[in-house]
């Protein structure tokens, strides 16, 4: 991983490899983030290649923005966030009974909007409420967990 930081801007380029079964998978990643006052922006592109052309390469993109509004009472800040992410058809690298890789995760687009309330010390925790909207090609039947939904999370930082 290579990281360059300058005046609120952060660039990251990385490479990873994994071999969940018989096929080596290479992941190439480039990302950029920028902080300006209470605003934070981030974009990332990932390319996933499977050895021996055993599965079509995967493209993934993520764009994110957030605005932090300082608070003075129970919560330290309230953050408003939006995100867009995309991933083309994807395989986890584990072959079927015929030894071939197959689509485990269908191509999708997702838009997320949410609000987070952050506690200050001594708790270091967040309460987040998001709405996630998924977009698929016609005729695609997504997994139960990947339909439009409202998500409420409680996160503790250690």
Where do the protein language model's features map onto the residues?
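Outer-membrane beta-barrel pore domains
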Residues: 8-158
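Short, small-residue-biased leader/transition segments that mark boundaries at the very start
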Residues: 2-4
């Amino acid at each position: 991983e290579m990281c360059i930081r300058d005046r609120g801007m952060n660039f990251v380029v990385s490479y990873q490899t994994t071999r969940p079964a018989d096929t080596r998978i290479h992941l190439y990643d480039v990302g950029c983030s920028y902080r300006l006052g209470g605003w934070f922006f981030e974009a990332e592109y990932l390319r996933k290649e499977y050895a021996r052309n055993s599965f079509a390469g995967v493209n993934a993109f993520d764009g994110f923005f957030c605005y932090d509004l300082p608070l003075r009472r129970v919560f330290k800040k309230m953050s408003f966030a939006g995100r867009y992410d995309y991933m083309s058809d994807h395989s986890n690298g584990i072959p079927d009974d015929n030894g071939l890789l197959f689509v485990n995760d269908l191509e999708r687009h997702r838009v997320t909007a949410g609000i987070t309330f952050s506690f200050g010390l001594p708790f270091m925790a967040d309460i987040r409420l998001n709405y996630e909207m998924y977009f698929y090609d016609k005729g695609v039947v997504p997994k139960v967990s990947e339909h439009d939904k409202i998500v409420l999370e409680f996160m503790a930082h250690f």
